[in-house]
């Protein structure tokens, strides 16, 4: 219940921030960056509530998913939801501050945010019970509970390492951090999937 309240507070804070700052913002707001500079600008009425609405939809979706989840998985889902909502809110604040004329290193913020998200999410991933919503979900991890535990424990470590690398590199790589994030996350998913399949074959090869 406490984690649910935190989610609601973050979403409400996002809407409240947009409402309070609306009159102070210019008529055009950046929504995309290249080299830490705005690359795409859209009119204020269209963009200022995009992130708050996305956050609301995201929260409602996760809330519906938790209804039939076990207590442990429900807690992990809300943890993931809260982390993502915080990341989106920080991105919203960064966008609004840039629009108000403040200098904000958006590439660094995104890199650090995603890195921390992966560290927290990866660390909690190993605690997930077998399910179809969170964790490393493949036909073989869902089929064998032991493979699920081994695969998610391995993926948890890989994602934490991936998060640390992204967080550190975000201080040095500038606009390339987005590409680096995509490559590292995809690599982590591929390695984790292959590792879980290896566990499955090792445990079930003689059956």
UniProtKB/Swiss-Prot annotation:
<dbReference type="InterPro" id="IPR012867">
    <property type="entry name" value="DUF1648"/>
</dbReference>
<protein>
    <recommendedName>
        <fullName>Immunity protein SdpI</fullName>
    </recommendedName>
</protein>
<feature type="transmembrane region" description="Helical">
    <location>
        <begin position="47"/>
        <end position="67"/>
    </location>
</feature>
<feature type="transmembrane region" description="Helical">
    <location>
        <begin position="150"/>
        <end position="170"/>
    </location>
</feature>
<keyword id="KW-0472">Membrane</keyword>
<dbReference type="InterPro" id="IPR026272">
    <property type="entry name" value="SdpI"/>
</dbReference>
<keyword id="KW-0812">Transmembrane</keyword>
<comment type="function">
    <text>Immunity protein that provides protection for the cell against the toxic effects of SDP, its own SdpC-derived killing factor, and that functions as a receptor/signal transduction protein as well. Once SDP accumulates in the extracellular milieu, SdpI binds to SDP, causing sequestration of SdpR at the bacterial membrane.</text>
</comment>
<dbReference type="GO" id="GO:0009636">
    <property type="term" value="P:response to toxic substance"/>
</dbReference>
<dbReference type="InterPro" id="IPR025962">
    <property type="entry name" value="SdpI/YhfL"/>
</dbReference>
<dbReference type="Pfam" id="PF07853">
    <property type="entry name" value="DUF1648"/>
</dbReference>
<feature type="transmembrane region" description="Helical">
    <location>
        <begin position="171"/>
        <end position="191"/>
    </location>
</feature>
<feature type="transmembrane region" description="Helical">
    <location>
        <begin position="100"/>
        <end position="120"/>
    </location>
</feature>
<feature type="transmembrane region" description="Helical">
    <location>
        <begin position="5"/>
        <end position="25"/>
    </location>
</feature>
<keyword id="KW-1133">Transmembrane helix</keyword>
<feature type="transmembrane region" description="Helical">
    <location>
        <begin position="78"/>
        <end position="98"/>
    </location>
</feature>
<dbReference type="GO" id="GO:0016020">
    <property type="term" value="C:membrane"/>
</dbReference>
<dbReference type="Pfam" id="PF13630">
    <property type="entry name" value="SdpI"/>
</dbReference>
